[in-house]
């Protein structure tokens, strides 16, 4: 099979799941022997690309001619077969850079957001959920809908250690791993945990992550009398993260809004019972009473009721974890998504 040279790029702040997805698609396509060249702007200098070397071309705005000329030179130097653009900014920059060029390289937009209008100039589309595809197609003409497009989820890496679903322990240990920012719903979870305490339901909880709301969340937990029950270790990685997840009975992802939520896929991969919300982005992957419990988003009472339900129905809690684990193996693991990525790029380049 032919091997392609691919520029994989993101512009605009890529903190969170988007940056992970940039590296993931680099890894999936590299696993099929393609040559991947990573490119970013200076706004993502704080993000680590691991062992991947990365090129940097600053972009000062959507219509920066200087940036477009530098990118044009970069395209001429690298001679790629395909450009994968992970943001509207990246799509515009590369389409502008190729204006008037004899040989046009196809641009594949990867849509990680519900704000899709800037990506419509792309030649092909990878939507991370069916809902993202609906949003794009609602803005496309009938002609544009014929461009290659496919729904391919984000991926999860299956643990290298034993991670099969197990019955909940008593008292349950609830774990959340997230950025401490408003849309992640950490403050809602803390209110829900206070309700569980009021109801006399025993538990312990670890809310791990950094972010602008960390101090506020700690203060909230203290005010609600949760100091003995809830800990805030900050950012956790490596073996500490593995140990934390292994000790979890319930993984909580209480996001108020989410595009997909890689945390959902990770909970599935680890075989953990998941409590999350009914936000439209989350419902693309988490199905209520099938592979997760989906409480009302931004509703502490609904979240507390859900956790209480799982604790009092351990057989169901285990069943959801088993279904999530099956989906991780069949749909969301690296090998499955890598195959889909590879198949799709052949439909674009040929």
What is the predicted role of each segment?
Residues 8-66, 149:
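N-terminal strand-loop element at the rim of the active site
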Residues 66, 153-171:
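Acidic anion/phosphate-binding donor-loop and adjacent secondary structure
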Residues 85-91, 111:
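Short His-centered aromatic/hydrophobic patch
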Residues 256:
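Aromatic "clamp/platform" in nucleotide-sugar-dependent glycosyltransferases that forms part
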Residues 273-276:
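Short hydrophobic beta-strand element within catalytic cores of glycosyltransferases
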Residues 288-289, 293-300, 309-314:
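Conserved acidic donor-binding segment of nucleotide-sugar-dependent glycosyltransferases
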